[in-house]
């Protein structure tokens, strides 16, 4: 490769990345996933597009995709709170194992019928497209106010279900590639334990060693993120080399780093944010270049039937079977989890395996995987907002600061600087700072007014448009945001959480007298928390509700996984009038 070729490679690569970045706002305007934009740019630059770039180097595509996926999962793991495992761990594990297996089998049977394949070949197609994609799920759910049980389940499932798909794909390729491979129960069990066991062990052990190294060594600030990424990639590669799941390993590594007091954690996350965007762009550009759109047209109708069958038939059945033991999930939540079974880069990466193994029909598998991913991103990704509304799993947006920055004043500092812009509707306008009910240990470090820095004191009165810089920790975020952020409209909050709020310790007898409810003797002696336990179980989340005595009772506040307030939704005025008559 000469200097001119290398320079051309840099120019074309930079141009495609720049175009992808500049076109990213188009996704929100058109209501389509941003990943689809990156994929489309790659396809337009390919051999059937205006770029006429002929790219069919599957090993390079495999390398780029795995590198990108590893970085995305490291970032996703660091941003996942272990606390969410309380409500989502076992449902996620069930979906990541049993759910993937059921989806694989049902999709495989459909593929066998549609494309005249053998049973094993059809199930291989099902295994390739059987898992949800972490890059797609993390990207599309980012910034969404979802019911925590649903949101955490989807994110943890997407970060942990790839090992099952890899296990099934690799096993089936081994069987199809060699008649001597013994597909016995012992072989399958050993392969399964190796994928998950080695992956989990190396992820946790390697993650702990990496965390120790980061905290132990005094390095320039910019090197901690490089150490975190290089260490994560080493764990990813070592796990793969030992027959484990590198995908699971690096996700668990990120989970450990993000949930322990890690030196320069905020700086690492800031760097990872940019690297994750670059990884997503690069991965989908390369995968877009790899496909030949004219070949997709040859399988368009049966490919569409396969994708629709998986979305409307295989995935919902798998979700309902996988979540059957978990009574806390409502039918609406199960349907939403079914719908957000987004496919992305992972199925396309898995479809490269048969190409590299030289299996018959390998090109068909690849084209099918690509087609299914495109349909999934367009149909499921494009209707995500509508699905959230129909399933009623979306919460009112939480008040947030306009910016937040980590303050690394000591190695494992949890301090952050939160920036707030005061709006006219805030009660603190005109109040001196000494009158604010600030969380204990927090402090307003600076106030900016008309682009001028003020030195705040207890007598400083706040004005509309002031910008406040507040020193605090993440645990203080909710209280501070209630004080200073632009809050959602009261009408929308009332529609969601109810017209009145009741303390969880309130006696049902008092509630009955207040709202004219007819209670039996046993109910009259109970408290509101007993009613919540009876209807919602031990781990309700914000936004859960139940019907009782013709009223809707909504979980309106949760602190440390304990319900503290219940919202009461009254029937519409017309129903109240009819009842009075």
UniProtKB/Swiss-Prot annotation:
User: InterPro entries from the xrefs?
Assistant: Cation/H_exchanger_TM (IPR006153), FAD-bd_PCMH-like_sf (IPR036318), Na+/solute_symporter_sf (IPR038770), NhaP2 (IPR023729), RCK_C (IPR006037), RCK_C_sf (IPR036721), Transptr-assoc_dom (IPR005170)
The UniProt entry lists membrane topology as:
Multi-pass membrane protein
The RCK C-terminal domain is annotated at 405-486
Keyword Transport attributed: yes
Single GO molecular function: flavin adenine dinucleotide binding
Keywords (alphabetical) are: Antiport, Cell inner membrane, Cell membrane, Ion transport, Membrane, Potassium, Potassium transport, Transmembrane, Transmembrane helix, Transport
* A Pfam match: Na_H_Exchanger
**One GO BP annotation here?**
cell volume homeostasis
- Provide the reaction this enzyme catalyses: K(+)(in) + H(+)(out) = K(+)(out) + H(+)(in)
Q: Name one GO cellular component term.
A: plasma membrane
Its function, per the record, reads: K(+)/H(+) antiporter that extrudes potassium in exchange for external protons and maintains the internal concentration of potassium under toxic levels.
Per the similarity annotation, which family is this?
Belongs to the monovalent cation:proton antiporter 1 (CPA1) transporter (TC 2.A.36) family. NhaP2 subfamily.
Q: What is this protein called?
A: K(+)/H(+) antiporter NhaP2
The gene it comes from is nhaP2
């Amino acid at each position: 490769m000469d200097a001119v070729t290398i320079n051309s490679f840099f120019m074309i690569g930079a141009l495609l990345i720049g175009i992808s970045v500049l076109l990213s706002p188009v996704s929100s305007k058109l209501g389509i996933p941003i990943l689809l934009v990156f994929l489309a740019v790659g396809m337009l630059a390919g051999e059937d597009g205006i770029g006429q770039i002929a790219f069919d180097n599957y090993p390079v595509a495999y390398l780029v995709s795995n590198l990108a996926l590893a970085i995305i999962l490291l970032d996703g793991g660091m941003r996942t709170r272990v606390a969410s495992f309380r409500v989502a761990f076992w449902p996620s594990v069930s979906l990541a194992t049993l759910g993937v297996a059921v989806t694989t089998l049902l999709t495989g049977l459909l593929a066998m019928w549609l494309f005249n394949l053998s049973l094993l070949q059809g199930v291989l197609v099902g295994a390739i497209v059987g898992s949800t994609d972490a890059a797609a799920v993390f990207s599309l759910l980012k910034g969404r106010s979802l019911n925590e049980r649903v949101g955490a389940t989807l994110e943890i499932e997407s970060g942990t279900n790839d090992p099952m798909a890899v296990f099934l794909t690799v096993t089936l390729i081994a069987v199809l590639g060699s008649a001597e491979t013994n597909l016995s129960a012992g072989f399958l069990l050993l392969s399964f334990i190796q994928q998950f066991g080695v992956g989990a062990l190396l992820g946790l052990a390697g993650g702990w060693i990496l965390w120790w190294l980061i905290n132990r060594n005094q390095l320039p600030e910019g090197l901690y993120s490089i150490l975190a990424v290089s260490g994560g990639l080493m764990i990813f590669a070592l796990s793969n080399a030992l027959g484990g799941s590198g995908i699971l390993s690096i996700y668990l590594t990120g989970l450990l780093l993000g949930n322990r007091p890690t030196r320069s954690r905020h700086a690492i996350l800031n760097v990872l944010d940019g690297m994750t965007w670059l990884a997503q762009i690069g991965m989908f550009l390369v995968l877009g270049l790899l496909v030949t759109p004219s070949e997709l047209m040859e399988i368009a109708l049966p490919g569409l039937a396969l994708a629709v069958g998986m979305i409307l038939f295989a995935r919902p059945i798998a979700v309902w079977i996988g979540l059957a033991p978990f009574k806390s999930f409502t039918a609406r939540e199960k349907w939403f989890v079914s719908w957000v079974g987004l496919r992305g880069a992972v199925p396309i990466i898995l479809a490269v395996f048969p190409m590299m193994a030289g299996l018959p029909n390998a090109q068909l598998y690849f084209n099918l995987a690509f087609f299914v991913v495109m349909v999934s991103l367009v149909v499921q990704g494009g209707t995500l907002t509508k699905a959230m509304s129909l399933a009623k799993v979306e919460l009112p947006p939480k008040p947030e600061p306009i910016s937040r920055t980590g303050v690394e004043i000591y190695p494992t500092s949890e301090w952050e600087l939160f920036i707030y812009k005061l709006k006219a509707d805030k009660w603190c306008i005109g109040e001196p700072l000494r009158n604010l009910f600030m969380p204990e240990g927090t402090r307003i470090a600076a106030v900016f007014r008309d682009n001028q820095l003020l030195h705040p004191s207890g007598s400083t009165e706040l004005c509309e448009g002031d910008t406040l810089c507040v020193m605090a920790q993440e645990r203080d975020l909710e209280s501070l945001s209630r004080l200073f952020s632009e809050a959602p409209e009261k009408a929308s909050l009332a529609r969601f959480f109810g017209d009145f709020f009741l303390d969880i310790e309130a006696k049902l007898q008092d509630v009955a007298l207040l709202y004219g409810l007819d209670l039996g003797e046993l109910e009259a002696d109970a408290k509101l928390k007993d009613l919540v336990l009876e209807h919602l179980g031990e781990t309700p989340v914000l936004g859960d509700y139940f019907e009782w005595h013709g009223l809707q009772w909504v979980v309106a506040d949760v602190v440390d996984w304990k319900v503290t307030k219940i919202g009461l939704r009254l029937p519409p005025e017309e129903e109240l009038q009819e009842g009075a008559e």
